Amino acid sequence: PMLLFFIISGWLIFTWTKKIYGSRAGLLALFLFSLTPTIIAHSRLVNTDMAALFGVILSTYFFVRYLKDQTKKNFWLAAITFGIAELTKFSTFLLIPYFVLVGIIWGYAYHHHIRSMLLGAWKSILVVVVGFIFIVGPVYQLHLLGYSAEKQQADAKIILGTYGNRLFADPVIW
């Protein structure tokens, strides 16, 4: 299945680039994507990197589509794909500052004033919050069914006890 994520990611890159710049640019983007050393190394492995890549590309596509055409449908597609991307790998939390930054730049690039930049940031934050509430939250709640608060606390203490930097581990209060 991870190879499938690689193939679909390549198709998304080709299609998105072709839509904006034409077929030749789409083929060039696909060529560069396919021959990137990181992609070559990870596309054949069974880990979450390719799924995360797919989630990041898909959510970025729908987020940019929402910024271009701010309809309810595009908002929900951006929020849902963001939530799904967040579920693929922990490091995809970096989509949060990325989306806020893209929203700010988008607001400035098209309107050239602070109000539009703040509005772009607000829309980005709204996509993130809705994605967490409707996608990430329910999935994590399913994992917590039957996991008592006492067991959660005991497990957290064990994990925090092994954490090397006490500056961050000690302030956790139960």
Give short role names for the model-derived ranges.
Residues 44-51:
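Short acidic/glycine- and proline-prone juxtamembrane loop motifs at membrane-interface regions
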Residues 21-27, 70-77:
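Membrane-helix interface segments
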Residues 12, 51-68, 81-82:
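Specific aromatic-rich, kink-prone transmembrane helix
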Residues 62-71, 82, 95-132:
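Perimembrane helix-loop-helix junctions
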Residues 29-34, 41, 61, 82, ...:
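Short helix- or helix-capping micro-motifs
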Residues 3-20, 58-62:
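Transmembrane-helix motifs of polytopic, lipid-linked glycan transferases
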Residues 136-174:
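Aromatic-rich transmembrane-lumenal/periplasmic boundary elements in polytopic membrane proteins
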